[in-house]
Amino acid sequence: IELDRDLVVGLKKRFSHQSKFSLREGDVLSAPLEAENGLTINKVVANIPYNITGPLLKRLIGELRKAPENRFETLVLLMQKEVAQRLIALPGTSNFSALSVRIQLLAKCQDVCDVPSKCFQPAPKVDSKVVMIKPFVSSEPDFYEIGNLLEKLLKHAFAGRRKKLRNTIGSFV
């Protein structure tokens, strides 16, 4: 799904002969995620506009309290490096955040490679990173039912970055 009409024309010229390549013009945040030809889309490869990374991730892999509208096996996404580092951050590291917990409860995230800003024309002000995301398949409705509770816990747990966890969640418990 591509919003830029000029890019759509170029992509169609370059990839239209690929039988497994599907391109639709539109806004990825509102366009249907199903294939137009009735086939199942199970992989997504995308260069995400940095300003819609959060909403797009919610749409593609779901939220703690809401299952995604489609189930994708694999997402390979190019995104702003700082956001990607938070997605893949491990507990105890400086990039570990509520976003890290949310995403890692929903999917396995793997660092693929860095992409310096100089690789783009025009060059953005920030570097990028490619991340592979493999969403977990949960058919358990209980998982999504406790999502609101998990969201509240995360809000309290990460409210004071330098505070001890027992102090920040004291009011939660």
Tell me what each language-model feature is.
Residues 171-173:
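Short, intrinsically disordered, charge-balanced linker/junction segments flanking boundaries
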